[in-house]
Swiss-Prot record:
HAMAP family: PxpA. Its EC number is 3.5.2.9. It comes from Thermus thermophilus (strain ATCC 27634 / DSM 579 / HB8). Keywords: ATP-binding, Hydrolase, Nucleotide-binding, Plasmid. This is 5-oxoprolinase subunit A.
Length: 250
């Protein structure tokens, strides 16, 4: 049995520092790098690409809404055409850095509010999927299972990678609990590790609003900008490997 462990990186810009890139890269098998819209100055993106290269980490594009002030976590009312163009632009930007360092683009995973909007808005999901397909129809697209986002990715003929979040709480509906909801974040590394094991080995996890929810996971996400992200990533990876689960890129 195997699973990918991913984290966001390269999101710092100017005087603003986000994440724990140097501590996280040795612990994950893939990374989603900012492309300049929600975060990531050119220098920081290049630095993250070189860190990924040094640690043998697969690199994906992490396009977001054009919202540096809100770190891409505020929804924006963009048309499907705007989403398509923005995603295509950002994939291309990261690809330039990867080409310069002799690395391939491994996957695409939208960031923050763009990801969440795609999960419930079919036109946004379709625009993302078509942008990825236009750039490279062989590129995998990371999605939340059971959403219109997954459906549109499959309709576009893309390779779909199903994602789960051991340090985020789920609702019975299968959706992630809103960040504003008490208990929506799992901050204890050991609890996150326990949840990761259930997700991978049992295909389910307890829901914040009671009961359990089915989970399908090709990759597990650790949010790199959380204060204790390295500790969570380390605990999750160690628990998986001790259970005989191989951690490697999809």
């Amino acid at each position: 049995m195997k699973v990918d462990l991913n984290a966001d990186a390269g999101e710092s810009y100017g005087a603003f520092a986000y994440g724990h890139d140097r501590e996280i890269f040795p612990l994950v098998s893939s990374a989603n790098l900012a492309c300049g819209f929600h975060g990531g100055s050119p220098g920081r993106i290049l630095e993250a690409v070189r860190l990924a290269k040094a640690h043998g980490v697969a690199v994906g594009a992490h396009p977001g809404f054009p919202d540096l002030v809100g770190f891409g976590r505020r929804e924006m009312a963009l048309s499907p055409e705007e989403v398509y163009a923005d995603v295509l632009y950002q994939i291309g930007a990261l690809s330039a850095f990867l080409k310069a360092e002799g690395l391939p683009l491994h996957h695409v995973k939208p960031h923050g509010a763009l990801y969440l909007k795609a999960c419930r808005d079919r036109e946004t999901a379709r625009a993302i999927a078509l942008a990825v397909k236009a750039f490279d129809p062989g590129l995998p697209l990371v999605v939340l299972p059971g959403t219109v986002y997954e459906e549109e990715a499959r309709k576009a003929g893309l390779r779909v990678v199903l994602e789960a979040f051991p340090e985020r709480a789920y609702l019975r509906s299968g959706q992630l609990a809103p960040r504003s909801m008490p208990g929506s974040w799992i901050t204890d590394p050991e609890e996150a590790a326990r949840r990761a094991l259930r997700m991978v080995l049992e295909g389910k996890v307890e829901a914040l609003d009671g009961g359990e929810v089915a989970v399908r996971a090709d990759t597990l996400c650790i949010h790199g900008d959380n204060p204790n992200a390295p500790e969570v990533a380390r605990a999750v990876r160690e628990a998986l490997e001790q259970a005989g689960v191989e951690v490697r890129a999809f």
